[in-house]
């Protein structure tokens, strides 16, 4: 059975997410993006009336949704918050290795390196708060004393860990992150 190709809009979003993650917002040209997505020239503005900036917001949302699913898949079967963090960090480390050990955070690479505008910053804040909210949900589920603080610590460890892993070109940094999270379980 052959798979149906993704609709053009989805191909544009996924391709943009990958390219922005690799080279940042300003490092990706529209011609290259359209060629990589195998999309006709008019399709970008058909699906994203404001062009590259609308596509950047959509691609960051798509990437964030992938991370939210990864957080949920790591914590839902876990028996403790620490076990969920171990699972999450293991999965993130595998993604790091698969990415070639250089790609940045898909949201930071897109929204913080994009146009200097309040819309991009507000969108990044909203997406990151979603990760923290998901982490706090699981911290609360495991009865941790300060779920918000625990989730913020998780977020900071993941973001900082990814940066250090990039600098060291080693996913070991990511695998060791759970050791740095205070244990309460």
Predicted regions mapped to residue ranges:
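Amphipathic alpha-helical packing segments from all-alpha helical-bundle domains
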Residues: 87, 117-142, 149, 179-180
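Hydrophobic alpha-helical segments that form the core
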Residues: 103, 108, 145-164, 176, ...
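N-terminal intrinsically disordered/low-complexity leader segments
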Residues: 1-7
């Amino acid at each position: 059975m052959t798979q149906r190709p993704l609709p053009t809009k989805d191909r544009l979003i996924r391709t943009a997410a990958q390219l922005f993650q690799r080279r940042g917002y300003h490092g990706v040209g529209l011609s290259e993006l359209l060629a990589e997505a195998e999309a006709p020239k008019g399709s970008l503005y058909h699906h994203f009336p404001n062009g590259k900036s609308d596509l950047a917001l959509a691609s960051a949302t798509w990437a964030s949704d992938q991370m939210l699913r990864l957080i949920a898949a790591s914590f839902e079967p876990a028996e403790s918050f620490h076990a969920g963090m171990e699972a999450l960090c293991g999965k993130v480390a595998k993604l790091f290795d698969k990415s070639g050990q250089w790609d940045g955070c898909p949201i930071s690479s897109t929204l913080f390196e994009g146009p200097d505008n309040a819309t991009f910053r507000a969108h990044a804040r909203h997406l990151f708060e979603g990760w923290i909210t998901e982490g706090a949900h699981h911290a609360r589920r495991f009865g941790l004393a300060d779920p918000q603080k625990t989730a913020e610590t998780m977020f900071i460890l993941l973001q900082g860990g990814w940066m250090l892993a990039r600098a060291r070109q080693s996913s070991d940094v990511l695998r060791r992150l759970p050791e740095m999270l205070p244990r309460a379980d």
